[in-house]
Amino acid sequence: MASPEMEERLRKIIVDQLGVDEAQVVPSASFTKDLNADSLDLVELIMSIEEEFGVEIPDEDAEKIQTVADALQYLETHQSNE
């Protein structure tokens, strides 16, 4: 399970990058369907996540990150391996 600090950091990135209300950023929220992100938004979001958390997300993994929960799970898995 992701730490509250990790969730808060991710939530801030999503709010800043996508210009959405913080209340909309829930684990089940789809970046494209619920938060209205387009493909450019997603690229910028992934880049911001990489920078904030010090991880590199390959394109094939980035394509699988569709929801807030997906992003948290990815970060949890890949930060613990460092």
Swiss-Prot record:
Origin: domain of life: Bacteria
PTM statement from Swiss-Prot or TrEMBL: 4'-phosphopantetheine is transferred from CoA to a specific serine of apo-ACP by AcpS. This modification is essential for activity because fatty acids are bound in thioester linkage to the sulfhydryl of the prosthetic group.
Domain Carrier: 4-79
Subcellular location field: Cytoplasm
Gene3D superfamilies (UniProt xref): ACP-like (1.10.1200.10)
SUPFAM superfamilies: ACP-like
Residues where O-(pantetheine 4'-phosphoryl)serine is found: 39
Keyword Kinase: no
Pathway terms, separated by semicolons: Lipid metabolism; fatty acid biosynthesis
InterPro entries associated with the record: ACP (IPR003231), ACP-like_sf (IPR036736), PP-bd_ACP (IPR009081), Ppantetheine_attach_site (IPR006162)
HAMAP family reported for this sequence: Acyl_carrier
Family that this chain belongs to: Belongs to the acyl carrier protein (ACP) family.
Reported function: Carrier of the growing fatty acid chain in fatty acid biosynthesis.
Family matches, as NCBIfam families: acyl_carrier, PRK00982.1-2, PRK00982.1-3, PRK00982.1-4, PRK00982.1-5
Protein name, as recorded: Acyl carrier protein
